[in-house]
């Protein structure tokens, strides 16, 4: 089965089997957000367990 190229661009698989993703709300309307909020949004997040299987199929 082919992988979805859109999903490959957005998600990374870790060695432990988790999937990393970027946070939303980072660029649009950013000036009014606090520096602390923008700093935390820069860090990668992991995909929740409920969506892990669906996204794993795509990559």
From Swiss-Prot:
Region spans: Disordered: 17-47
One Gene Ontology molecular-function label:
structural constituent of ribosome
| Record's keyword annotation contains Amino-acid biosynthesis | no
One Gene Ontology cellular component annotation held by this UniProt entry: ribosome
The record's section on Gene3D superfamilies has:
4.10.410.60
Top-level taxon: Bacteria
Which of UniProt's keywords are assigned here? Ribonucleoprotein, Ribosomal protein
- Extent of Basic residues compositional bias: 17-43
- Gene Ontology BP annotations: translation
Which Pfam families does the record match to this protein?
Ribosomal_L35p (PF01632)
Q: Which PROSITE patterns match?
A: RIBOSOMAL_L35 (PS00936)
> Per its UniProt record, what HAMAP family does this chain match?
Ribosomal_bL35 (MF_00514)
Spell out the family assignment given in the record's similarity comment: Belongs to the bacterial ribosomal protein bL35 family.
User: What name appears for this protein in its UniProt entry?
Assistant: Large ribosomal subunit protein bL35
């Amino acid at each position: 089965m082919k992988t979805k190229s859109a999903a490959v661009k957005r998600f990374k698989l870790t060695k432990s089997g988790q999937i990393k993703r970027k946070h939303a709300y980072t660029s649009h309307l950013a000036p009014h957000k606090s520096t602390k909020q923008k700093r935390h949004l820069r860090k990668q997040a992991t995909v929740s367990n409920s969506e892990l299987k669906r996204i794993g199929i795509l990559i």
